[in-house]
Amino acid sequence: RRVGWLDIPLLCYCAALNDIDSFALTKADVLTGRDTVPVVTGYRLGEELLESLPFSVADMEAIEPVVEQWPGWDQVDETAMQPFIERLESATGIPVSILSTGKRRDEVCIFAPFQVEGEVA
């Protein structure tokens, strides 16, 4: 199975663009059993270290990801994933409100109940 690593600067950009106030983590079972999980925390542009996406196309083509190894988990539950979740929340400033722990609808942890705003389709 091919897996793309989490890109924190891109995630922050998308969250700001879409006014996201919390995350739902899904498919965490795909990475179960890894000691560490590679996470992009910034980009290198020549000698410069960037914490956010560059805006020029030329710079986008020239950047290299800066990858950190974050703690992995041996099972998908809120206790085992807590170090990863805390690090994600710290890096983005956005809380994780839902953790999907399996394929079934009842396999979910809700950390912060939320209200649906506006119309629901």
Segments and roles (model prediction):
Residues R1-A121:
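Non-transmembrane, aqueous-exposed alpha-helical and coiled segments at domain scale
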